[in-house]
Amino acid sequence: PVNIGGALVSNASLHNFEEIKRKDIRVGDTVWVQRAGDVIPQVIGVIKEKREKKLKPISPPEICPVCNSKTIRDKIKTGKKEKEEKYIRCTGAFNCSAQLIERIKHFSSKSAFDIDGLGEKQIEQFFHYKWINEPSEIFELEENYLQDLLEKDGWGARSVENLVNSINEKKLIPLEKFLFSLGIRHLGECSS
């Protein structure tokens, strides 16, 4: 980890594999990192003077590191031409725990259901406990795991009550937020 603008950073975004190729980033490179918008750390380039000879280019992953499913790049038709999409994705879908967790995070994100007190850390914790395996199970937490939650470190009566109230407040949301929460490919926040 390094300190960038007062924040301790251990990961930085490269967006997609095309960025890795475009910036010619290799395993073992020393890179420049900035916090985009003073928030998200991103790799902006390689310090080529520090590059050791014979560093290997990064190969696109062929297997998901989480579920061992095959990875693919979808084809996009633009007129008569067909090209590969920028993004490499795992084909594991509901068999990939990383995808399930990210789907739940997306569902409860600010642009979707926006459930106060249910952030990334809590979602990962509840997934680990096997309390939430899909987004709809968020609404069953109170009924199924309220007592268990009270017994977990960091959860008192007040924080559990606040979470339950937050979840109950979000049972009805605008249609566009609900559509966005579903995580349908190519249906972004604006188009929903």
Feature map (PLM): residue ranges:
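A general structural signal for short secondary-structure junctions and capping/turn motifs
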Residues: R22-D24, V33
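Short, well-ordered loop/turn sites that connect or cap secondary structure elements
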Residues: D24-I25, I132
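Nucleic-acid 5′ end/cap handling module spanning
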Residues: P1
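Structural signature for extended repeat/solenoid scaffolds and their inter-repeat hinge/linker regions
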Residues: V31-S192
